[in-house]
């Protein structure tokens, strides 16, 4: 988890109108990566167009063209999830700059082959009172519980929240588990839960450094 090498790119270009030019504040936001059915899946949003997904059987090889799961403005940070029983889901957040919402997570049932989102979504958590700027959800299943790791409070001074429930549709309970504390590393923001080969658990997240990026 310490030393990384770039081996490939999921997208050579973004095949959407206008992206042959520089587009500040647009483009690919907060992708998530998952392994299912012998394939790697990368799901991402473009905040003005919708939610897309790509897949490959070989991360060093060719990735599929981005497939649009749903056209929508202001839907961001999607995370697909395949349940142990074969049910597929997708959770996403909202961009306040496009939707006027910044504190809710929405859940969709998804076709198992990730070809489409099914039906209308449902809001599974509303952090209006306790979790402002709730975003970046990542979904996991462990020991009979479903977990959603999601940062709140904004990238500069926020914290990491974990939601858990016995079923994906809820009800979800929330606990704030990680704060900046006295360190100089702001955040912690939009991280992922990783379990090592020996069962040890790690949390990997980004740090916002303004002009230097994240």
Features from the language model and the residues they span:
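Carbohydrate-active catalytic/glycan-binding domains of CAZyme proteins
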Residues: 1-214
């Amino acid at each position: 988890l310490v030393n990384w090498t770039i081996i490939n790119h999921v997208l050579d270009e973004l095949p959407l109108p206008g992206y042959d030019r520089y587009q500040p504040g647009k483009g690919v936001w907060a992708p998530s990566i998952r392994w299912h059915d012998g394939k790697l899946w990368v799901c991402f949003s473009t905040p003005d167009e919708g939610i897309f997904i790509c897949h490959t059987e070989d991360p060093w090889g060719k990735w599929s063209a981005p497939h649009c799961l749903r056209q929508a403005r202001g839907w961001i940070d999607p995370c697909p999830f395949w349940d142990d029983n074969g049910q597929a889901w997708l959770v996403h957040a909202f961009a306040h700059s496009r939707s006027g919402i910044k504190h809710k997570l929405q859940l969709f049932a998804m076709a198992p082959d990730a070809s489409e989102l099914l039906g209308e979504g449902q809001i599974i958590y509303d952090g209006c009172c306790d979790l402002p700027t709730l975003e970046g959800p990542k979904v996991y299943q462990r020991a009979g519980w479903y977990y959603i790791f999601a940062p709140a409070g904004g990238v500069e001074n926020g914290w990491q929240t974990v939601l858990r429930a016995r079923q994906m549709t809820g009800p979800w309970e929330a606990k704030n588990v990680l704060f900046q504390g006295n360190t100089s590393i702001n955040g912690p923001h939009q991280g992922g839960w990783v379990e090592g080969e020996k069962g040890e658990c790690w949390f990997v997240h980004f740090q916002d450094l303004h002009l230097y990026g994240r």
